[in-house]
Each structure stands twice: as C-alpha cells, then as structure tokens.
Amino acid sequence: MNIGLGAARKTILLVDADPHARATLRKALEASGFSVGEAATGEEGERTAHRIHPDAILTDLMMETIDAGGEIARRLAETGRQIPVYMVSTAADGLVGATGFAELGISGVFLKPVDPAIVIRTLKTRLGAG
C-alpha cells in the first residue's frame, strides 16, 4: 500500500505528548510510504515543522498547554505556510461539531482512539498521494 515509486514521499509531522500514540501512527504511516517526523510538545512541533517542512501535521489538541495543537495551527497560518493541520482529539476536548476550523488553520479532526486507516486515507486524498 505504498504511495508509489515515482511519487516523492510525503512527510507527516506527528505532535503528541504520548509516545505510544506517536509510535502507533508512525508505524502505520511509514508502512503506507510516508516519511514521518515526531515531536512531543507544541513548541518542539513548531520548531520541527520549520526544520523538516512537512506536507501535513497531525497534532494532539491538549498537550503541555491548554491548546497547544490549536496554537501550532494558528502560528503556522500566520507565517503564510499552507500546511494542512489535523487535530487528534477526544470528544471531551470540545472540538466535535465545532465550527471555524478554517479560520484557525485546522484542516480536520480525528477522534481518539485514532483509526490509522482513516488517517492514511484522508492524508492520501488531501496530499494527492493515493
């Protein structure tokens, strides 16, 4: 289920304080042909995004600060970079059914527990990597 031999590998940045959550998604993404970068905090995620120039970012909403994931999306949008940012959240985070994602620079939300197949399908569709 690789992205394709002739296509450039798309890079995904995973930002989550939970190393198990990152490892689970990383393994699934790499098995599907994506290159993966990781960060454990919002601040580290922002630095890593500037360093590796990912094609998309998956970030937990709630990390070391109240809204670390939303802050990453907002700051990247302020720089003018057009990187799809997807939140990984629980229904308790209050994002389900919320509106205004586009204004925050958020491309979508994946609910925990995350189904890697849905994430991969969404990323391949969005990034033209299918």
For every predicted segment, state its role:
Residues 1-11, 115-130:
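Non-catalytic signal-transmission and effector/linker regions of two-component phosphorelay proteins
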Residues 16-17, 112:
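Acidic di-acidic motifs
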Residues 19, 40-44, 67, 117:
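Acidic phosphotransfer microenvironment of two-component signaling modules
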Residues 19-37, 104:
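Two-component/phosphorelay signaling modules centered on CheY-like receiver
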Residues 27-31, 48, 100, 122:
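Alpha-helical interaction/dimerization surfaces of two-component signaling modules
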Residues 38-56, 78:
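Acidic, metal-coordinating helix/loop segments flanking the phosphotransfer/catalytic sites
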Residues 60-61:
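Active-site residues of response regulator receiver
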Residues 67-71, 78, 91-110, 117-122:
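Alpha4 helix (beta4-alpha4-beta5 surface) of REC/receiver domains from two-component response regulators
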